């Protein structure tokens, strides 16, 4: 139920931004929804993959809310997990085509329940937060890119710094294909899929 509600919310984001215009660098929009393939490569555990949804809505000239949800399953074992985050971002135009972006978010990780020797155990249920800063730019009329540095922490896991790189190739003003990679201490996370921008 929670998965369906979050997925529907992300898909409904375009309706929430009816009259809000963001003050953003040329070629950059904070009103979008995207979905696609996601994967995680871990140093000390099996890799996982699945699907994900991401979205953002400008709520004021320099502020946007954003969210993401992904569901992945580990390869070769019967175990999966859900991750989601919801946050607030601030964007400040530092040149005609470049924005400085800062974002903070609440994060949630929920692992599947599992059974060992006929005994059922609850999956991990972890809460945390993240903060990141970076730049986002319209590199050409058809290509947008970003680079971010961040930190995430939670009460049940150790904090970690990470880097994030991403780009979008635009087919027209509304549609494009986007890719994102996040590098952390123990894992690398990937996302690729179509984006609808308004």
Predicted features, each with a name:
Residues 1-29:
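Cleavable N-terminal export/targeting peptides
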Residues 20-75:
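Short glycine/proline- and aromatic-enriched beta-strand/turn motifs that initiate or cap beta-hairpins
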Residues 20-23, 41, 52, 59-61, ...:
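Outer-membrane beta-barrel proteins
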Residues 29-31, 47-51, 80-84, 108, ...:
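Residues that define the transmembrane beta-barrel architecture of outer-membrane proteins
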Residues 31-33, 61-67, 95-100, 111, ...:
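Repeated loop/turn-to-beta-strand initiation elements of outer-membrane beta-barrel proteins
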Residues 33-35, 55, 65-67, 88, ...:
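Membrane-embedded beta-strand positions of outer-membrane beta-barrel proteins
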Residues 37-43, 61, 69-75, 82, ...:
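Transmembrane beta-strands of outer-membrane beta-barrel pores
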Residues 86, 163-169, 174, 187-198:
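Outer-membrane beta-barrel "beta-signal"
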């Amino acid at each position: 139920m929670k998965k369906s509600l979050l997925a529907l919310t992300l898909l409904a984001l375009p309706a929430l931004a009816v009259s809000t215009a963001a003050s953003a660098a040329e070629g950059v929009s904070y009103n979008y929804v995207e979905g696609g393939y996601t994967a995680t490569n871990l140093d000390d555990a099996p890799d996982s993959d699945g699907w994900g949804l991401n979205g953002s809505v400008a709520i004021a000239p320099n502020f946007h809310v954003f969210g993401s949800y992904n569901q992945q399953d580990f390869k070769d074992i019967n175990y999966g997990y859900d991750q989601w985050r919801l946050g607030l971002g601030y964007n400040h135009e530092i040149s005609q085509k470049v924005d400085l972006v800062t974002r903070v978010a609440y994060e949630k990780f929920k692992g599947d329940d599992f059974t060992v020797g006929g005994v059922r155990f609850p999956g991990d249920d972890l809460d945390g937060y993240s903060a990141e800063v970076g730049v986002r730019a319209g590199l050409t009329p058809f290509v947008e890119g970003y680079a971010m540095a961040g930190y995430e922490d939670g009460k049940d896991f150790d904090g970690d710094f990470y880097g994030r790189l991403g780009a979008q190739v635009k087919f027209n003003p509304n549609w494009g294909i986007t890719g994102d990679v996040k590098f952390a201490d123990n894992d690398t996370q990937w996302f690729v899929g179509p984006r609808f921008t308004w």
